[in-house]
Structure formats: structure tokens, C-alpha cells
């Protein structure tokens, strides 16, 4: 949309013209961060830059992760430095610019800006293979990141790629990432602080709080709102998380919570739970991920052992860029579909997520059934992800395989612009947590051993319906925590 004239009228009777066109912004890498600038021209009053890292913009409404409003040029340019922003070779910047020229406001959306294509003196490691003259403070050390870039003595090249790049060839079967949770390395794992945004899918939780480590296991345990903020009413209060919020799609909706009880905003999230990811520190394209975990038990709890897209290349709504579930088993000890099929914690699932709809989602999942709840013991869950298939296993036993061809589903025409495995042909990062309730993992009219699912999907008061049934589901939360022994990622054998 270069030179798009929005023509916001600041005086009655002023019309939008195309006499002014926003110049192409200059984006240059700094030693840490980057600068953005445009040349000054007569009549320019205000300039605003909005930048996202690895998230495209869908409109001019949302501010960027990094944003600034300038009222004065410097040395003939409107310029700003976004310092202390760690950039990696695989990152892509998205930029929209707003300029008040005379009495009209113009807005322009730039093309995606791969970091390695930017100007400036500096380059993240990985932009210039084999060039050791560049240094990058964002390149993770083996000690801090659990990356182990040691290749076998005889190396058969793998199709796996990692970000940040590790500076050596990646060999088949090579260990790329390992976390054993002897302690919680907060330089590696970033805590989410945000409200789920998608109203068609959103679980009934607020992501906040710190995950813990106990006896060599990561522990992620959901809490009731009353335990999280006893000073704030669940039905009539306001909470602004902006200073800590990690939301990037719509910070107003993801970072500022308010409730009016029976009003349109409903109640506060009934559940608050930690969630961590390697979004800022480690991502990979193709490989085998292994997670040894003990899944939670309790009605309407779902473990999140996920791979999520680093760059939402194919879109950012309705899972247009995909999500991969390494494994999940619902926390319910007994849960039946309307026609009697059991879908409780004795059923293990793994597969891609490409839709917010619970029925469509499960149609793509692979499953395995056993006589006891998967949360009774630790199990090793594995996903082998390559350029032509997804292979799911538990404790070394394969229970399902899915070949490429997702473009044939006609869910997103942009997938046809990618490779055969699109949308799963880009970098993905690791995300760990639990969700509770929501619309994506539980169809309507499910029944436990003693009561029917207490909320209706997409009902405006679904959270309230769930909360009001607390006396039914809370007594089942005997083991609500997700426990993880280790996470490992190996290069694929492809």
C-alpha cells in the first residue's frame, strides 16, 4: 500500500490529495537494535513509526511492538533509534508509518523487511555465513541456551535449521536444544503476560505468573482468579498489565482487562496460569522434539506442549500460520461426546492446529487410547517434523503419521505460496503451559461422569457459565499442574 492516502480530515472541508507521498523509510541495523528514518519535507508536522518483529500488521489501527511519535526532525530527517532490541538473522520487521503533512494524515505499510537485508554497519550472526568478523550479543552461548552445536565425527547434512544460527553445519540426529530444568533459565524461557485474543478460540485464562522448578521438573499450575488477585472482584474490576504485557497483536485487548459481570465484557478470566516460550531465544525448522512430561488431571484442563510460528508468514488470525501440538490429553477422567465416544484423559492426541473450530480441529489430529489416564505417569511425547511429514509417538511407539498436503484443505490460499509442507515450512518456537476451558478444545454437549459441560461455545457469557459451575469442576483438580522433566530437539534424519 505504498503512498496510501488515508486523508484524515483535521479541518472541516479539507480534502485528501495525493500531493504528498510518504518516502520509503530507511531502516538500518545498530549494534543493538535498529534505526528508522524518513527525510524531512516542507509541511511535515508529525511522524510516527510502528514496528513489529515477526508479526505482520493487518490494519493501521494497532500500534507496533516498538512505536514512537516524533514532533521534530533532526538534521533534515525524522529519525528514531529502537535500541536494546535483540535481532536475529531469521527475524523479519514489519513497519507502518504515519505522517501528518499540512492538515492531512497519510499512512503507509512497508513491505516485510528481513533483518539480513537491512542497511547499516552491523549484522546478526548468520547473515554472513563463515564470516567471523561480525559479533552478535544475541548469539546464545551453549551454557545459556542449552544449544549444543557439536556435530558427529561423520556428518550427514540435515534439512533442519535453527535460529539463532549456530555457526556449524547441522548433521542428521544432532542434538540442537536441551533443557533439563535443574533451574528455570529465564534468559532462555520468556514468560507470557497477556490475555488470549481470539474470541473464537480463547481459553478462559489469563497468562501470568511464574513457572516453578521442583525436584528437577518444570511445574506450571493454574490458579483461581481469587488466589491471583484477591483484592480485585472477578465481576467488576479493571487490571492494566501494559508495563509487563507481552501481547503484540492488539495490546489494548491483550493487556488491559476489565469486567462488568453480566455486561458485554463478562467477568475476569476465572483461571490464571504461567506460560513460557523460547520465542525470543530459540526456534527451529524441521527436527524431532521430545518432551518428557506428566500431564495435568482435572476437568477442562488441557496441557499446551506446542510449536508456534516465529514469523506469522501466512497470516495471524485463525491459525493461518499454523500451530503444532506435540501432545495433549484432556484432564477429565471421564468425558464423552454426545454419541458416547470417549475423549477424556485416556485419549492422547497430536497434530496440527489450523482452525479455531473444535470439530474441525480434532478432524486433523492423530490419537492413541489406553486404559489409564495419561496424567497418571510421566511419558515421553515426540514429534518428528520434516519437509514431507509429521510423525507422532509416545514412549518410542509411533501412533500416527501425517503427510504434507495441507494446501489442499483450502483453509488459506496463501499456503499455496509456500512449499509442500506449508504452513509448516517456517521457523517455529517452543511454547509450554496449560489452558482451561475455551471453545477450541471442547465441543458442546460433552458430558463427564456426573455433569454436562457447563458452558456453550461462543456464548457471550461462556466464562461466567464456567465460573458458576466451579463447585462441579474444582473438586476434580487433584493434580492440576503440568510437570516437565526435559525438552530436547534433534536434527531430523531427512
Curated annotation (Swiss-Prot):
Molecular function terms from GO = (1->3)-beta-D-glucan binding; lipopolysaccharide binding; pattern recognition receptor activity; peptidoglycan binding
Secretion signal, residue range per the UniProt entry: 1-19
The CBM39 domain sits at 20-120
Alphabetized Pfam families for the sequence: CBM39 (PF15886)
| Domain named GH16: residues | 135-494
Gene3D superfamilies with a match to the protein in the record? 2.60.120.200, Beta-1,3-glucan-recognition protein, N-terminal domain
Glycosylation sites noted in the Swiss-Prot or TrEMBL record: 56, 81, 185
Query: Where is the protein localized?
Result: Cell membrane
Q: Which PROSITE patterns match?
A: CBM39, GH16_2
Q: Can you supply a Gene Ontology BP term from the record?
A: regulation of innate immune response
What InterPro entries does UniProt report for this protein, alphabetically? BGBP_N, BGBP_N_sf, ConA-like_dom_sf, GH16, GH16_GRP_C, Glycosyl_Hydrlase_16
Alphabetical UniProt keywords: Cell membrane, Glycoprotein, GPI-anchor, Immunity, Innate immunity, Lipoprotein, Membrane, Signal
What cellular-component terms does GO give this entry?
extracellular region; extracellular space; plasma membrane; side of membrane
Map out region (Disordered) in residue numbers. 126-160
Q: How does it sit in the membrane?
A: Lipid-anchor; GPI-anchor
What family name appears in the similarity comment? Belongs to the insect beta-1,3-glucan binding protein family.
Its biological purpose: Plays a key role in innate immunity by acting as a pattern recognition receptor for beta-1,3-glucan from fungi and lipopolysaccharide from Gram-negative bacteria. Upon recognition of invading microorganism-derived products, acts upstream of protease spz processing enzyme SPE to activate the Toll pathway and to induce the expression of antimicrobial peptides drosomycin, cecropin and attacin.
Query: What name goes with this protein?
Result: Gram-negative bacteria-binding protein 1
- Which organism does this record belong to? Drosophila melanogaster
Amino acid at each position: 500500500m505504498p503512498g496510501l492516502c488515508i486523508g484524515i480530515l483535521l479541518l472541516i472541508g479539507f480534502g485528501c490529495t495525493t500531493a504528498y507521498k510518504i518516502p520509503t523509510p530507511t531502516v538500518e541495523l545498530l549494534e543493538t537494535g535498529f534505526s528508522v528514518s524518513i527525510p524531512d519535507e516542507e509541511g511535515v508536522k508529525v511522524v510516527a513509526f510502528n514496528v513489529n518483529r515477526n508479526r505482520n500488521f493487518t490494519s493501521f489501527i494497532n500500534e507496533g511492538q516498538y512505536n514512537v511519535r516524533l514532533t521534530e526532525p533532526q538534521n533534515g530527517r525524522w529519525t528514531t533509534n529502537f535500541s536494546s532490541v535483540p535481532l536475529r538473522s531469521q527475524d523479519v520487521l514489519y513497519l507502518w508509518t504515519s505522517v501528518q503533512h499540512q492538515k492531512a494524515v497519510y499512512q503507509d505499510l512497508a513491505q516485510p523487511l528481513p533483518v539480513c537485508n537491512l542497511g547499516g554497519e552491523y549484522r546478526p550472526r548468520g547473515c554472513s555465513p563463515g564470516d567471523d568478523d561480525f559479533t552478535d550479543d544475541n548469539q546464545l552461548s551453549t551454557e545459556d541456551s542449552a544449544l549444543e552445536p557439536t556435530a558427529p565425527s561423520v556428518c550427514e547434512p540435515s534439512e533442519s535449521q535453527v535460529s539463532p544460527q549456530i555457526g556449524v553445519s547441522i548433521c542428521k540426529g544432532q542434538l540442537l536444544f536441551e533443557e533439563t530444568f535443574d533451574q528455570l533459565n529465564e534468559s532462555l524461557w520468556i514468560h507470557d503476560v497477556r490475555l488470549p485474543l481470539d474470541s473464537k478460540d480463547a481459553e478462559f485464562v489469563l497468562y501470568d505468573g511464574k513457572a516453578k522448578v521442583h525436584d528437577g521438573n518444570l511445574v506450571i499450575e493454574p490458579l483461581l482468579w481469587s488466589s491471583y488477585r484477591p483484592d480485585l472482584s472477578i465481576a467488576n474490576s479493571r487490571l492494566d498489565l501494559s508495563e509487563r504485557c507481552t501481547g503484540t497483536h492488539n495490546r489494548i485487548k491483550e493487556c488491559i482487562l476489565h469486567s462488568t459481570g453480566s455486561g458485554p465484557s463478562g467477568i475476569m478470566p476465572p483461571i490464571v496460569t504461567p506460560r513460557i516460550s523460547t520465542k525470543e531465544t530459540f526456534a527451529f525448522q524441521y527436527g524431532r522434539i521430545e518432551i518428557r512430561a506428566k500431564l495435568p488431571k482435572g476437568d477442562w484442563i488441557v496441557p499446551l506442549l506446542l510449536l508456534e510460528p516465529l514469523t506469522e508468514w501466512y497470516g495471524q488470525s485463525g491459525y493461518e500460520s499454523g500451530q503444532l501440538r506435540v501432545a495433549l490429553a484432556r484432564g477429565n477422567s471421564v468425558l464423552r461426546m454426545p454419541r458416547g465416544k470417549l475423549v477424556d484423559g485416556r485419549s492422547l492426541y497430536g497434530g496440527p492446529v489450523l482452525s479455531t473450530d473444535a470439530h474441525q480441529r480434532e478432524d486433523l489430529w492423530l490419537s492413541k487410547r489406553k486404559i489409564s489416564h495419561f496424567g497418571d505417569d510421566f511419558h515421553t511425547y515426540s514429534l518428528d517434523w520434516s519437509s514431507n511429514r509429521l510423525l507422532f509417538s509416545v514412549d518410542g511407539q509411533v501412533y500416527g503419521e501425517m503427510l504434507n498436503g495441507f494446501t489442499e484443505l483450502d483453509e488459506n490460499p496463501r499456503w499455496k505460496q509456500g512449499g509442500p509442507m506449508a504452513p509448516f515450512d517456517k521457523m517455529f518456537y517452543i511454547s509450554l503451559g496449560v489452558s482451561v476451558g475455551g471453545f477450541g478444545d471442547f465441543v458442546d454437549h460433552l458430558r463427564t461422569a456426573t455433569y454436562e459441560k457447563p458452558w456453550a461455545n461462543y456464548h457471550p457469557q461462556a466464562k461466567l457459565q464456567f465460573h458458576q459451575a466451579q463447585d462441579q469442576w474444582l473438586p476434580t483438580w487433584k493434580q492440576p499442574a503440568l510437570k516437565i522433566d526435559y525438552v530436547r530437539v534433534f536434527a531430523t534424519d531427512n
